Swiss-Prot record:
GO annotations of cellular component type: cytosolic large ribosomal subunit
Organism domain of life: Bacteria
Protein name: Large ribosomal subunit protein uL18
Biological process according to GO: translation
Length: 119
């Protein structure tokens, strides 16, 4: 019971440490990742104006996943990259949200890179 709470708190501490260094500007916004048990969410954020420019998640109607969570994460990465490029955003700073760069987070990042986003 306590282990999950400790894991969540450790992730939040890591995220705060990373957020001190990772900052999104209007020229190069931040690609933020949030991972829940079932779904994965990605936002491209301009931290100067505190505005979400683009968002995508595995709950979007554009994503119909019949496979694994990693496949869904890759599709979310491709979708967020496609939406960002439509808005003229090509370069971003990747914010893994305190999660280990592995599994679903890595799949989302590789999907976004393959779709043309640079980070």
């Amino acid at each position: 019971m306590f282990k999950k709470a400790d894991r969540k708190e450790a992730r939040e501490r890591r995220h705060l440490r990373v957020r001190k260094k990772v900052f999104g500007t209007p020229e190069r916004p931040r690609l933020s990742v949030y991972r829940s048990e079932k779904n994965i969410y990605a936002q491209i954020i301009d931290d100067v104006n505190a505005v979400t420019l683009v968002a995508a998640s595995s709950l979007d109607k554009a994503i119909e996943v019949k496979g694994s969570n990693k496949e869904a994460a890759k599709l979310v990465g491709e979708l967020v990259a496609k939406r960002a490029i439509e808005k003229g955003i090509n370069d971003v700073v990747f914010d893994r949200g305190g999660y280990v760069y592995h599994g679903r987070v890595e799949a989302l990042a590789s999907g976004a890179r393959e779709a043309g986003l640079k980070f």
